[in-house]
Design a protein with these regions (language model features):
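Switch/communication elements of ASCE P-loop NTPase nucleotide-binding domains
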Residues: 1-91, 102-103, 341-523, 527
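Short, cationic low-complexity segments
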Residues: 133-143, 328-339, 518-519, 523
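Short hydrophobic beta-strand segments that form the core of ligand-binding sensory/regulatory domains
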Residues: 133, 305, 396
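A cross-taxonomic marker for long C-terminal extensions/tails that follow the last structured domain
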Residues: 528-538
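Extended helical coiled-coil dimerization/tether regions that scaffold
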Residues: 185-201, 205, 209-212, 216-223, ...
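Residue-level signal for secondary-structure boundary sites
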Residues: 111-113, 314, 498
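Residue-identity detector for glutamine
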Residues: 3, 63, 124, 168, ...
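P-loop NTPase switch/coupling surface
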Residues: 1-299, 470-483, 491-492, 537-538
Length: 538
């Protein structure tokens, strides 16, 4: 399950782990911290995916050399969206007297924890990473402490415990079989069946031999269990300039296992060092698996940010206008070349009808200069620019979701999609349908992975619709399956300093277990009561 945790980042002195679902609704007053979490996610993932070795050319002899491999964290990373952070000083929590920022998140089955230490007042755009932890849950863990120049490997809980427990189970079964065989020998001897006694005794000897082998294996596993982790001086295995530095750091553990031990046998710490190297050697397959998984994850980080934007009624959308989000979305949708009958095409047509916009859209290029968009309604083909602001807003959103869905089918990887206030310009009924749209998106484009959506919203109607859908999921599948079947999770962000965002938690009937702060769900009712009071006075 995707998650995010923060310390000393912008609004948050400390943000407890937010465990995300497929579709996550962030709600709260302005400046409550919703965008802070979103920015932390994009900033961290942008940095993680782009860490590479730096290759420079020396002045002497023009030979290629490597500069220090200590990775840098860039606060001006804007690969997914312009985050407007820029420096360490703007990233940290202003009122907390701590020079360390921690961002921890889980992405596609790998957990990352990054610690950056900086100084205030220097306008530092990038800072060396002080500590980096990488975990493949239940598999293996890696920690690189650049302040102490150490690197540590340990097995995940499942791998650390399973071998011994499986051997122990085999021991129990063997002991049971031995006890039964001994009883059978006694019964056969009492009946005077010498042939059967000999047959059972032969099997009994095999069982006893198996037990001895299992006892020996258990002793070896117990000996291995004495090493909970292996820590070494920080070093690195450099294979290629283009490979992500994190993958190469993990591969370094295999390099250490392959390097002959030069320490003298009578040197202090020799036995401990040998045990740690053996621990790496015994787990080289585990380390190689982690490196392969990490390489795949880092090569396929897909994040898309769909900002709240003004619906434009420009007839021609220029390809040269890089600042116009509408132009970019239309351009990329056209370039995707979605064919009739594909799932992305069916998705687009379905939701054009659901939102009562039309039957189909047509994007027409203008000699490489730009595009115009027409919508096929029941009566005619209408320029999108001539439609209402709400329809324009929805078509742009649908084009972006369709583009992402089509791309995800090619990449076969999950995406993180962040949608900012999609309810702008929409009638309340259409706002509620956004919940159905997002749920259908995750169902249509979910093979083989499920995407993670984060929706920042102030729409009561969208949230109310998720409650109805949650209750319907429970009716269809039963209360025991509600956690698996409900794709939504609503997080409320309080504005008060020190308070944590919290999961509203759906009940089986669709109601929330927790309450919103005053001013959200209760605001319409409060104003209605005010009107009633005034009408009575009149």
């Amino acid at each position: 399950m995707a998650q995010i945790r923060l310390k000393n980042f912008r609004k948050y002195e400390s943000l407890d782990s937010l465990n995300l679902n497929n579709i996550n609704i962030f709600v709260g007053k302005n400046n409550a911290g919703k965008s802070t979490v979103v920015k932390a996610i994009m900033l961290a993932l942008d940095n993680i995916r782009s860490l590479r070795w730096k290759d420079v050319t020396s002045k002497e002899g023009m030979q290629s050399i490597l500069i220090s491999p200590k990775p840098l964290f860039r606060f001006d990373a804007n690969g997914f969206h312009n985050l407007h952070i820029g420096t360490f000083e703007r990233a940290k929590c202003n009122w907390l007297d701590d020079r360390r920022i921690v961002i921890a998140l889980e992405y596609n089955g790998v957990e990352f924890e990054i610690t950056i230490a900086g100084l205030m007042g220097d306008g530092q755009v990038s800072m060396p990473i002080e500590k980096l932890k990488i975990s493949v849950p239940f598999h293996s863990n890696y920690e690189f402490d650049f302040s102490k120049n150490t690197m540590t490997f340990s097995l995940g809980e499942k791998l650390a415990n399973d071998p011994s427990s499986e051997t122990q189970k085999a021991m129990w079964w063997t002991n049971d079989e031995i006890a039964m065989a001994e009883k059978d020998v006694e019964e056969a001897a009492a009946s005077g069946d010498a042939l059967k006694v000999a047959e059972i005794q032969q099997n009994l000897q095999k069982l006893i031999s198996r037990r001895k082998a299992l006892q020996s294996e258990l002793k070896q596993l117990e000996k291995k269990g004495e090493i909970a982790h292996a820590t070494f001086d920080l070093s690195y295995f450099h294979e290629s300039v283009g490979e992500n530095i994190l993958v190469q750091y993990i591969k370094t553990f295999i390099m250490i296992a392959d390097t002959p031990i030069t320490m003298k046998k009578n040197a202090k710490g020799y036995s401990d060092h040998v045990s740690k190297v053996q621990y790496l050697d015994e787990n080289r397959k585990v380390i190689a698996e982690a490196a392969d998984k990490l390489e795949k994850v880092l090569s396929n980080i897909f994040v898309d940010y769909i900002p709240a934007h003004a619906a434009t009624q420009k007839l021609i959308l220029s390809v040269d206008d890089k600042q116009d989000i509408n132009s970019r979305i239309v351009h990329e949708y056209f370039q995707e070349n979605i064919l009739p009958g594909e799932s992305a095409d069916r998705f687009m047509k379905k939701w054009l009808k659901e939102f009562e916009i039309g039957e189909e859209i047509y994007v027409k290029p203008l000699d490489g200069e730009g595009y115009y968009v027409k919508v096929d309604t029941e009566d005619d083909k209408v320029h999108l620019a001539d439609m209402g602001m709400g329809s324009i807003q929805l078509v742009i959103l649908l084009m972006r979701l369709t583009t992402i869905g089509h791309r995800s089918e090619s990449s076969l990887q999950p995406w993180w999609i962040i949608v900012e206030e999609p309810e702008q310009n929409l009638h309340p009924m259409l706002q509620s349908k956004l919940a159905d749209l997002f749920e259908d998106f995750t169902q249509t484009f979910c093979d083989p992975y499920t995407h993670t959506l984060i929706v920042e919203t102030h729409s009561e109607y969208l949230i109310r619709r998720t409650q109805i859908m949650a209750a319907e999921f429970v009716e269809d599948c039963g209360e025991d399956m509600m956690d698996e079947m409900i794709p939504f999770r609503v997080f409320y962000f309080p504005t008060e300093k020190g308070r944590q965002p919290y999961d509203m938690q759906y009940l089986p009937n669709g109601m929330f277990a927790n309450k919103f702060d005053p001013g959200f769900f209760d605001e319409a009712g409060r104003m209605h009561m005010e009107i009633l009071k005034k009408s009575k006075k009149g």
